[in-house]
């Protein structure tokens, strides 16, 4: 049985919703799944003034615990085509794990949220993949066997690089059914691969 960590940062709750969908999919494979988040860097008063979603149930992760999992599925909103600073600050503390090769051979995957349809989903995912490659992780995306990412009948997220959602500039759009199903598919897919690698 694979042990999977879903580790996310969410400002307004969109990535949080996707994280729990990812976890749901991973659990369908029989994996042991833990959902955690990275710390918020914005002062609480400022976060409240800007309507951040601060009532998130997931506990805050530590860098050291990343080595305890067979797979880590990271979730972050985009910031100008890159991961959010909160996630970057957490990732930048993993140098000790890198020195030990603690994440080599583990499965890594990423999902994201953007304000607009062309707001940097793919660059956020692929730039995050670079970090995972440096750690020697086995990088897994969202394959086209998830057919929900095809078609042009509606505005929707999901890419071959990872699941995604579109939040709109004011955060009013919530993850759609097909976006959440993409997240569940990615969770199942990653957990299944992690289980196979763990048996080898």
UniProtKB/Swiss-Prot annotation:
Q: Which reaction does it catalyse?
A: a quinone + NADH + H(+) = a quinol + NAD(+); a quinone + NADPH + H(+) = a quinol + NADP(+)
Sorted UniProt keywords: Flavoprotein, FMN, NAD, NADP, Nucleotide-binding, Oxidoreductase
Query: NADP as a keyword?
Result: yes
Cofactor section: FMN
* Amino-acid positions noted as binding substrate in the UniProt annotation, renumbered to this chain: 98
Enzyme superclass (EC): oxidoreductase
**Keyword Nucleus (UniProt):** no
Q: Which family does it belong to?
A: Belongs to the WrbA family.
Name of this protein: NAD(P)H dehydrogenase (quinone)
């Amino acid at each position: 049985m694979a042990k999977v960590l879903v580790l996310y940062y969410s400002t307004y709750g969109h990535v949080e919703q996707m994280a729990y969908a990812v976890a749901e999919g991973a659990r369908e494979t029989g994996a042991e799944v833990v959902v955690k988040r990275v710390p918020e860097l914005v002062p609480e008063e400022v976060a409240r003034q800007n309507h951040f979603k601060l009532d998130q149930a997931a506990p805050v992760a530590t860098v050291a615990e990343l080595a305890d999992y067979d797979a880590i599925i990271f979730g972050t909103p985009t910031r100008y085509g890159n991961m959010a600073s909160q996630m970057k600050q957490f990732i930048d503390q993993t140098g000790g794990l890198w020195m030990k090769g603690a994440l080599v051979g583990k499965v890594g995957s990423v999902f994201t949220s953007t304000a607009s349809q062309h707001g940097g989903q793919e660059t956020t995912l692929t730039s995050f993949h670079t970090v995972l490659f440096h750690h020697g992780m086995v990088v897994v995306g969202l394959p086209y066997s998830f057919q929900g990412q095809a078609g042009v009948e509606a505005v929707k997220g999901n890419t071959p690089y990872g699941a995604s959602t579109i939040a709109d500039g004011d955060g009013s759009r919530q993850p759609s059914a097909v976006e959440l199903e993409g997240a569940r598919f990615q969770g199942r897919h990653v957990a299944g691969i992690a289980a196979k690698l763990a048996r080898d």
